[in-house]
Amino acid sequence: IDPGPNIKAHLNSILASVSLNQTITHILITHSHIDHSPLAKILQEKTNAPIYAFGDSFSGRSKMMVELTKKGDLKGGEGLDKDFSPDVYVKDGDQISNDEWCFDAIWTPGHLGNHLCYGLKKSGVLFSADHVMGWATSLVSPPDGDLTQFMDSLQKLLKFDDYNLYYPGHGDKIDNPKEIINYIIKHRKMREKQILKSIAEISLNSTQIAEKIYIDVNKSLIPAAARNVFAHLIDLKQRQLVTNSHELNFESIFSSI
């Protein structure tokens, strides 16, 4: 699952971990960011294993994001593996298996439109990739990231009782996944309230809002924080809780309604 970045030493480590009586038969990709998917093609050359994923890097975008991308510059595109494409396209609810194991594919767009989690059946284990991480909440940067989808996917994962141990793409294993998911939901709702409060009396853009509400982070992280804020603002716009100046893009000025 997720061979990682195109680094030769990393490839060698993967191949070295395969014992003489083992074979890599499938390459499963959770999503196509450059720290997860670029090594897949090189690993395939070594193993002849097919690559499984939801789709290319632009698959799974919501109708809203597709329309906004056509109308204006949303910026974004951080860390996207733009050349990625799978051999086998995986749909939500598909099962990927051989004689020894079976994975449930769970489509969880939000961090990226083509994001999948993989649940190893009868093990209690879910590979949650970057949707539920072990050390921080995920970056959601439009148009690749979509906060409406992200929140919906969190609610979706809460309904799965079979998986009580998550292995994320970053950070330690998570042995209390529902508690962590509920924390992420609560945290995002807290940010939403902060955003609405910050523009209740004055109109601001995403960066200005980030500077007001992310007071406890290093200033070098404000650009990333502003992308999260922008994702919230698009979600709030869809819910008719904010209005914006001119065409909706990253430079738009927002006011609460």
Where do the PLM segments sit?
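Alpha-helical elements of Rossmann-like donor-binding domains used by nucleotide-donor carbohydrate transfer enzymes
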Residues: 13-16, 42, 149, 156, ...
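Histidine-centered divalent metal-coordination motifs
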Residues: 30-36, 111, 170, 232
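Metallo-beta-lactamase
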Residues: 5-7, 68, 87, 95, ...
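Aromatic/hydrophobic pocket-lining residues that form the small-molecule binding cavity
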Residues: 37, 150, 154, 229
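Active-site HxH/HxHxD metal-binding segment of metal-dependent hydrolases
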Residues: 5-99
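Short hydrophobic beta-strand that contains or immediately precedes a catalytic carboxylate
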Residues: 1-2
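C-terminal regulatory/interaction regions
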Residues: 194-257
